[in-house]
Regions:
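P-loop (Walker A) phosphate-binding loop of NTP-binding proteins
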Residues: 52
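Hydrophobic anchor at the beta1->P-loop junction of P-loop NTPases
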Residues: 49
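Pre-Walker A (Motif I) flank of P-loop NTPase domains
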Residues: 43-46
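Post-Walker A alpha-helix
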Residues: 60-61
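Conserved glycine(s) of the Walker
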Residues: 55-56
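GTPase G-domain guanine-specificity segment
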Residues: 369-373
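Switch- and interface-adjacent substructures of P-loop NTPase systems
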Residues: 29-36, 40-41, 67-356
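N-terminal pre-Walker A segment at the start of P-loop NTPase domains
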Residues: 14-38
Length: 373
């Protein structure tokens, strides 16, 4: 946040220990912007930012937008060569092309940082977008290079909980139930203890009871919310934490069956998949498939696969301070996320017809809490 905000941004940001973490994170982002500013063909960049477990993504985006808007005046963009050399002339907000996506709350975020005492911006609870047009002087001049060039920067903010849903596409209900580590780790087991006791008494072959399903799904969602508050990251399904317009819908009334054991005949995959449609197992499996097809895939298709670049902010220090169980949980979440990204340089055909993420940055915030020794 630049000096023009009316507050001393360095002291404000360092109060919670994230300023230097964001400062260090700006280096790879600055290199990326620098490369784009010097390229002759790419004039648009779609950058998505998300974070795990309150890593500070909304504050980061608010600060980034403010710095770019005041480039050449009071911004602190020393890691961006175009700004350091005086060639970045500034940025202005433009109307976003997709009117169906909420605008990123930049102004409320700045108002929070200017408040007395300063406050962190409110976290967003859905996807939002903000479009900037950057004006700059190219480093090299020529008869094909204009004196003043422009880069359109589309910034997207979306909840990390939604990102954690993408690994669900690799599972069916049976394998997802087995993958849930609800029995592992004393702290996590304690957060789901009552739900585990109740769900382990269920008969997967028994007839589904809608009232019972709704009650157990809500109890499972409460366990996820407790786990999020305790700092856990590997939490699925993500929409149970931020249901939005789906709150109360049957699509969110399912849960894993951690008691499934392929070595036992009565809970083997073959036995359970042969059960009638009104059985508990078949009902939960059907809702899991619906969630994959109607909730997760549309987000992946309509938004995620159109991003060019992705930044994932992670509070590694918080996980380290919380002990081995929390740290392993964060590691597990990151391992799963790696399978959700498409890699590779963008060819012309790819850029025109199938945009995808070809650059991913995973950044640890709160780096200033780590001493030099």
């Amino acid at each position: 946040v630049g000096q023009n905000t009316g507050i001393r941004s360095r002291s404000v940001l360092s109060q919670t220990g994230s300023y230097k973490g964001i400062e260090r994170m700006r280096q790879p982002l600055s290199r990326e912007l620098s490369n784009l500013l010097e390229r002759g063909r790419d004039r648009q960049l779609r950058l998505a930012v998300t974070g795990l477990s309150q890593a500070g993504k909304t504050a980061f985006l608010t600060s980034l937008v403010n710095q770019l808007r005041h480039a050449g005046v009071e911004a602190q963009l020393d890691l961006l060569p175009a700004a350091r050399e005086g060639r970045l002339l500034g940025a202005q907000r433009l109307n976003q092309p997709d009117l169906g996506v909420p605008r990123f709350p930049y102004d409320p975020g700045m108002a929070a940082l200017r408040d007395t005492p300063p406050r962190w911006p409110e976290p967003t609870r859905g996807i939002s977008e903000l479009r900037l047009q950057l004006r700059y002087r190219p480093a090299r001049s020529g008869w094909l290079t204009p004196e003043i060039a422009h880069l359109t920067l589309d910034l997207f903010d979306y909840p990390g909980e939604w990102l954690l849903d993408l690994p669900l596409l690799q599972h069916d209900f049976y394998s997802w139930s087995q993958a849930q580590a609800l029995h592992e780790g004393e702290q996590r087991r304690g957060l789901f203890s009552e739900w585990l006791t109740a769900v382990e008494q269920l008969d997967p072959a028994g007839e589904a009871d809608e009232a019972q399903l709704a009650a157990l799904a809500e109890e499972y969602a409460q366990g996820l919310r407790r786990a999020k508050k305790a700092g856990f990251s590997d939490l699925q399904p993500g929409r149970f934490l931020l249901p939005g317009e789906l709150e109360g819908a049957p699509v969110l009334q399912f849960f894993p069956l951690p008691q499934l054991d392929a070595s036992q005949h009565n809970t083997s995959r073959e036995t359970l998949e042969a059960l009638p449609a009104n059985s508990l197992y078949a009902t939960l499996a059907a809702r899991f498939r619906y969630y994959q097809q109607q909730v997760v895939k549309p987000f992946y298709r309509d938004h995620f696969r159109r991003f060019d670049r992705q930044i994932v902010l992670v509070d590694v220090l918080g996980a380290l301070n919380a002990g081995p169980e929390r740290f392993e949980d964060l590691s597990s979440a990151l391992r799963q996320l790696m399978h959700s990204f498409d890699y590779g340089q963008r060819s012309l055909l790819t850029r025109l017809f199938a945009p995808r993420i070809d650059r991913l940055a995973i950044a640890a915030t709160k780096a200033d809490h780590v001493t030099p020794d």
